[in-house]
């Protein structure tokens, strides 16, 4: 007697593929950034890396509907607005500016900043959903602290 195919098996295999792509590209990027002679070349690849990670998340997301697109759009628009206020009016985060690492800028703010914010917020949200923290408040606080820590770590590169 034949066993019916497991419809989840294909989903599990593609999730493993997406996770493998994320791990591989992050390890290669980290290695390139840590080797002084390769650092300038790898910094030029940062926008492409962010776009690749965006593609991986979009392709792996289970339900792309109006709510998801609204979520993405709000992050893109909101993050650009917040960064514009920070860079041009020195509000919220103090006095700072972006270098060329994140690529093309519109009014001193990299256009890809929305992708970066989306990746960070989405990934942190997934991590907090899968965490063992029972309290929603603790997940929100932990997620916010994690985002601040990540920002402190990646800010020098941007």
Please place each PLM-identified region on the residue numbering.
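Aromatic-rich, lipid-facing transmembrane alpha helices and their immediate juxtamembrane interface loops
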Residues: 1-158
